[in-house]
């Protein structure tokens, strides 16, 4: 009995440590700032209901009535405000846009923890909010964890018109192992145990949410985009995802890093040119 109690204490302590370690410490509230209107360059603020009675802070840009909508998903620890740089290029390319803060990020409601599946749930909440207003078709653009989220959504939502995955990781496990090693946890059995604890905590096996697997179930056109100088999610991750679907193009961006907004901006015309070519409407 004492052994079981001791094990329970260790597991509980490890789970608490992981949750605290992954909590977003700084949150950018800019997305909630009042805007002009849905057709104005600055868009308009909105609150979108999502799971567990939470709401999301969103910014809605509808300069093109009846045209497709790009739903843009930020990465871990970032926020929708970091993706506002995309709104003007999207407008020029003929797209409407919605940018939002995932739960526990930016000006959205707090949550017990954030995870790739919850990013995906929030993306679907925005899609449902748009569908209730008769807006679409919807294309998804996601960065980093947001890229994994949009691939997961598209694997189970066939109405998605197209997906752009920016800097996706291939599988959560190597990302977690790298993070654990950076925190002094390098022994593989301990890494494996903590990875399993994360799976139990988020309610999903890593294999079921890994981009290298979810991309196989997507019927919509997909573009993978990755910077060759990405040190956070090294380029081999994108190579692995692309190898899982040889028909999916991989756009390599020379010298571009992970959170490299100027670098990505230099290549937006090519990325949005592809998107415009595959999305009807």
Where are the regions that the model predicts?
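Conserved alpha/beta-hydrolase "acid-adjacent" motif
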Residues: 231-237
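Catalytic histidine-centered segment of alpha/beta-hydrolase-like enzymes
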Residues: 256-268
